[in-house]
Amino acid sequence: MKTTCLLISLILIQGVKTLPILEIASNIQPQNVDSVCSGTLQKTEDVHLMGFTLSGQKVADSPLEASKRWAFRAGVPPKNVEYTEGEEAKTCYNISVTDPSGKSLLLDPPTNIRDYPKCKTIHHIQGQNPHAQGIALHLWGAFFLYDRIASTTMYRGKVFTEGNIAAMIVNKTVHKMIFSRQGQGYRHMNLTSTNKYWTSSNGTQTNDTGCFGTLQEYNSTKNQTCAPSKKPLPLPTAHPEVKLTSTSTDATKLNTTDPNSDDEDLTTSGSGSGEQEPYTTSDAATKQGLSSTMPPTPSPQPSTPQQGGNNTNHSQGVVTEPGKTNTTAQPSMPPHNTTTISTNNTSKHNLSTPSVPIQNATNYNTQSTAPENEQTSAPSKTTLLPTENPTTAKSTNSTKSPTTTVPNTTNKYSTSPSPTPNSTAQHLVYFRRKRNILWREGDMFPFLDGLINAPIDFDPVPNTKTIFDESSSSGASAEEDQHASPNISLTLSYFPKVNENTAHSGENENDCDAELRIWSVQEDDLAAGLSWIPFFGPGIEGLYTAGLIKNQNNLVCRLRRLANQTAKSLELLLRVTTEERTFSLINRHAIDFLLARWGGTCKVLGPDCCIGIEDLSRNISEQIDQIKKDEQKEGTGWGLGGKWWTSDWGVLTNLGILLLLSIAVLIALSCICRIFTKYIG
């Protein structure tokens, strides 16, 4: 009887501690699974901001039921790229992240911002984008969007150009899972409501039967079990409690989480849904019509765990992949005698892997060498190099195999970073200017730490010119630059190409004649007088006419040059003001976050906070386009077009006809007078 009561009590306590989120089907024995499904958030450092930039063009075919999802807003200079937006979540969940005392760690959305999203959603970016090639943001998290007008509404038939500067708040453990290839297998989710997920179609990867890639419909009636991973990896246990409440009419609550299930690389009570995948290129390879929409800036991407002779050797890290862009606030980890991976790559950015200490990991001295050809290697045995973009795969093949030394770690993992006197270890801190802010009563939420500290890097894409270039400090070493904070890239398309073969186009200074002849009054009178001299006058008049034509062409050329320079100046000014407007909105959001517990910005400032930043970029763009159209219109020839009686020659012909008629009338009158004189006389 006592044993039964004890078991019932333990079951009740376990039911209180674990949070029902989802059900995971696994073939792995319970003793091989590290129980990471429970836990509470101890400090806000465990919640990190992951920012990224979306760009491109999309046409909204139908209005969305909810406006809390990604959108693209017109009115700013569009990028000249093709873009395909991925999954648009049909069900939106409210989310709450609380500390152990039950206090919410997510601030309420500002009241003066329309359609401010705070929901669980599913998004995927196809093509050559930061999260391209099958990596889906399918984790439970709070999504906070900052676009150019603080609005995420999409309207019917509207072409949305330009992207959003987005931020997603996730748990640190989940954040680490997104950019680390920890498990080769995947888990099966049983959701009570109809959902969409991504399945990979790449057959070259082993154990690649999983749940990302091509968009497919999924509901609880389907019974697809993904291949589990061979060995779970131990993870930190500091995770936020997540409570999901569906706001959609067809959404219901989620099933109970089994703490003994296969969840080695997921913190379901944190903010993740659990799916992880190896880096594949199947989705991007099948999208032939897509082109790159992002500048080539370093981006954390998944990496493969080392699996040597025994299953206890694991390394966990973040690989910065060239050709990808992702503004991510990476957690600061205390490195211990770690080394980095350095490869000779033809891409702009070298691959680097800051190693992260792992819980319950001891005596890691195994070295793993990545093969030169990723497709012919076994991913479960070696550390794979990230696959490049399909458009740059030929020029970015690795020429040297990197060697990774797995660090020695202790059997415990601390969630708070500790300063290390070792200079090499300091280089492995992902954010050099990462503020070490722990949760204390009365402290502000450092959610915007990564976005505020991230440098702005305008890295141009093809057919693009930039006017700003704020790179990292000159004193930073090359190794430190590899681990620099990710950049927020804001690159706008610049002045379009104009036909340079057009005569007197005014595109550059050499098109127009340097000498502009101004004829004086005396010269005009002299030319007019000399033109009446027989034989000599027509020659003088011809030279005079040739000079006038040359001057006219030169004036037209200079006017075109002035129009081109004016249009370029207006575009540069529009670009600067657009970026300033964007950064002003971001700063306003940050101020709203900081002043939220005192009632918001408007409560502190009063009526002075109601300042609207009007977006007149579309009007300016239309004026620039009109200037370009006007200056590109050419009127060549002698005006022979149109109706003959309204052209220049038509007027002369009419005058000639009138003159001939007058002469004929005079001759006729003269003849009539002679006839009358003859008969009368």
Curated annotation (Swiss-Prot):
Annotated organism of origin: Lake Victoria marburgvirus (strain Angola/2005) (MARV)
PANTHER family: VIRAL ENVELOPE PROTEIN
CDD domains the UniProt entry points to: Ebola-like_HR1-HR2 (cd09850)
Extracellular side: 19-648
Annotated Polar residues bias: 244-259, 278-290, 308-331, 348-388
Residue numbers marked as site, Cleavage: 435-436
Organismal lineage: Viruses, Riboviria, Orthornavirae, Negarnaviricota, Haploviricotina
Record's signal peptide: 1-18
Family assignment from sequence similarity: Belongs to the filoviruses glycoprotein family.
Role summary: GP1 is responsible for binding to the receptor(s) on target cells. Interacts with CD209/DC-SIGN and CLEC4M/DC-SIGNR which act as cofactors for virus entry into the host cell. Binding to CD209 and CLEC4M, which are respectively found on dendritic cells (DCs), and on endothelial cells of liver sinusoids and lymph node sinuses, facilitate infection of macrophages and endothelial cells. These interactions not only facilitate virus cell entry, but also allow capture of viral particles by DCs and subsequent transmission to susceptible cells without DCs infection (trans infection).
Keyword Iron in record: no
Glycosylation sites: 94, 171, 190, 202, 207, 219, 223, 255, 310, 313, 326, 337, 344-345, 350, 360, 397, 408, 422, 487, 564, 619
Subunit comment: Homotrimer; each monomer consists of a GP1 and a GP2 subunit linked by disulfide bonds. The resulting peplomers (GP1,2) protrude from the virus surface as spikes. GP1,2 interacts with human CD209 and CLEC4M (collectively referred to as DC-SIGN(R)). Asialoglycoprotein receptor (ASGP-R) may be a liver-specific receptor for GP1,2. Members of the Tyro3 receptor tyrosine kinase family may be cell entry factors interacting with GP1,2.
The name this protein goes by in its record: Envelope glycoprotein
InterPro entries: Ebola-like_HR1-HR2, GPC_FiloV, GPC_filovir-type_extra_dom, TLV/ENV_coat_polyprotein
Note in the entry: Filoviruses entry requires functional lipid rafts at the host cell surface. Essential for infectivity, as it is the sole viral protein expressed at the virion surface.
Keyword match Secreted: no
Keywords, alphabetical: Cleavage on pair of basic residues, Disulfide bond, Fusion of virus membrane with host endosomal membrane, Fusion of virus membrane with host membrane, Glycoprotein, Host cell membrane, Host membrane, Host-virus interaction, Lipoprotein, Membrane, Palmitate, Signal, Transmembrane, Transmembrane helix, Viral attachment to host cell, Viral envelope protein, Viral penetration into host cytoplasm, Virion, Virus entry into host cell
Transmembrane segments: 649-669
